[in-house]
C-alpha cells in the first residue's frame, strides 16, 4: 500500500479515495482488485450512475503462446505482447484495452496502445548515455519502484530474463518501505 498518508490505511479506504474521480455516466475500468476494494468502487459507481467494467467479470486478459489475448462482450482480440517489460504489464494493457473498447475504438487502436506504450523508469532498458558507454556489454535497466508491489514486479520481470549475474542499485526516500521493496528481490 503506497501513499497511505494521503489515501488511507486499508484497501477499501484507498479504493474509496480513488473512486472519487468517478463521474456520472463515464465507464469505470477496474483491473484485478481485492473484493473489498471492488465493492467500494462498484458502490460509488452505482451512486454516480457510472457503468463498471471489472476484470474477471466484464473482461479477461492473459498471455497465451507469446501473445496477449483479451476478451469482452464484443469478442476476442489476439494482440502482440505489450512493449513494456514485466508480466504485470499484460494486466495493465488489458485495462487500457477495456477502456479503449468502452470508447468504441477498434482493434488497430488497441494494438497501437499495447505496442507503443512507453513508461519511463518502469523497467526501462537504458541504451544510450555515459553509463552505457562505460560498460557497453552490460544491460542497464532503470526502475522507479519504491514499495513492496514494485519490488515484486521487478523480481517477476527479472525471473523471466535469461539468468546472468545481476547487480541492483537502489535509492529511495527514507519514508519508503525499503525492506518491503527488497524482500522479493
Where are the model-predicted features located?
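Nucleotide phosphate-binding/pyrophosphate-handling subdomain across enzymes
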Residues: 1-2, 10-13, 75-185
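Acidic, Mg2+-coordinating active-site environments of NTP-dependent enzymes
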Residues: 1-80, 93-111
Amino acid at each position: 500500500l503506497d501513499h497511505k498518508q494521503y489515501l488511507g490505511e486499508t484497501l477499501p479506504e484507498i479504493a474509496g479515495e480513488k473512486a472519487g474521480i468517478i463521474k456520472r455516466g463515464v465507464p469505470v475500468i477496474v483491473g484485478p482488485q481485492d473484493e473489498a476494494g471492488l465493492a467500494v468502487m462498484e458502490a460509488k459507481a452505482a451512486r454516480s450512475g457510472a457503468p463498471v467494467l471489472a476484470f474477471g467479470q466484464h473482461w479477461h486478459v492473459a498471455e497465451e503462446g507469446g501473445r496477449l489475448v483479451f476478451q469482452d462482450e464484443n469478442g476476442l482480440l489476439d494482440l502482440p505482447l505489450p512493449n513494456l517489460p514485466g508480466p504485470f504489464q499484460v494486466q495493465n494493457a488489458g485495462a487500457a484495452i477495456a477502456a479503449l473498447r468502452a470508447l468504441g475504438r477498434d482493434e488497430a487502436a488497441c494494438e497501437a496502445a499495447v505496442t507503443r506504450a512507453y513508461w519511463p523508469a518502469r523497467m526501462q532498458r537504458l541504451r544510450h548515455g555515459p553509463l552505457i558507454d562505460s560498460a557497453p556489454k552490460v544491460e542497464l535497466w532503470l526502475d522507479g519502484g519504491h514499495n513492496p508491489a514494485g519490488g515484486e514486479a521487478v523480481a517477476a520481470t527479472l525471473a523471466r530474463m535469461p539468468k546472468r549475474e545481476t547487480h541492483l542499485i537502489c535509492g529511495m526516500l527514507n519514508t519508503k518501505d525499503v525492506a518491503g521493496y527488497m524482500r522479493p528481490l
